[in-house]
Regions:
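Walker A/P-loop
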Residues: 52
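Walker A (P-loop) phosphate-binding loop of P-loop NTPases
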Residues: 47-48
Length: 235
């Protein structure tokens, strides 16, 4: 099937590997403590704090614990390969197709990144998480204000646990950069900031441009569109 083929490289099927980034045990261990429960695991937080990587690290943890890679399916609406999943019906159809093609046995682990970009996503997530005839465990991420706790409790009928993901802490920053804990490294952390992708940039100008672009994205996608603000200059 062409849809399965198009998303294959983003999944662990057929011996594929995925980039898991820097280990963040503070979060992965928290998520892991709920493994085995059918409550929906929801990772929230602002854009680019590393939610996707924590999803992947959780999936790799499952594989290391003996779960078959065929029982794990990734869906990421930020990638064009998943453009065919526009609404809850598309999502439901894809999961059925995945089951027919991969034929997983036992519990199925579904990871959906940027779930808010799928219209009506909560209908499928609620249905699968409450289906006592099938064994699903669901993990989702969301970045914008549609994923605020107040709305989550309505969308998911209270059957979820939320993990709020933050940028790198000073301890994580020092560990990743292999820097000694102290005043000098702390000042560097304060200057650089904690966004994980900044680790790959050396130039201060590049870092500033990255943060400026991120700020504009948050304003446009999470504030202006959300609240239909007409006079953008007021921001």
């Amino acid at each position: 099937n062409e849809n399965i083929e198009s998303v294959k490289k983003y999944n662990l099927w057929f011996g594929n590997t995925i980039d898991c980034g820097f280990p963040r045990p503070l979060y992965t261990e928290s998520v892991a403590s709920y493994l085995g429960s059918k409550v929906v695991k929801v990772l929230t937080g602002q854009r680019r704090v590393g939610k996707s990587y924590i999803l992947r690290q959780t999936a790799m943890h499952l594989v290391q614990q003996g779960v078959s890679s065929n029982n794990i399916v990734f869906i990421n609406r930020e990638l064009t390969a998943f453009d065919f999943i526009e609404n809850y019906k598309d999502l439901d159809n894809f999961i059925r197709l995945y089951r027919e093609e991969l034929k997983p046995e036992g519990r199925i682990y579904i990871f959906i990144d940027e779930v808010q970009d799928i219209d009506g996503w909560e209908r499928v997530v609620n249905s699968l998480s409450q289906d006592y005839t099938e064994d699903y465990e669901i993990f989702i991420t969301g970045s914008n204000s549609k994923m605020f706790s107040g709305e989550l409790s309505t969308l998911l009928s209270g059957r979820y646990v939320e993990f709020h993901i933050f940028p790198l802490s000073y301890g994580e920053y020092a560990s990743i950069h292999q820097l000694p804990v102290g005043r000098e490294s702390y000042l560097k952390y304060m200057a650089d900031g904690g966004y994980p992708e900044l680790v790959h940039f050396q130039s201060s100008d590049v870092k500033r441009n990255y943060i400026s672009g991120l700020k504009d994205t948050v304003l446009l996608k999470d504030i202006i569109r959300r609240y239909t603000i007409r006079d953008v200059r007021l921001l």
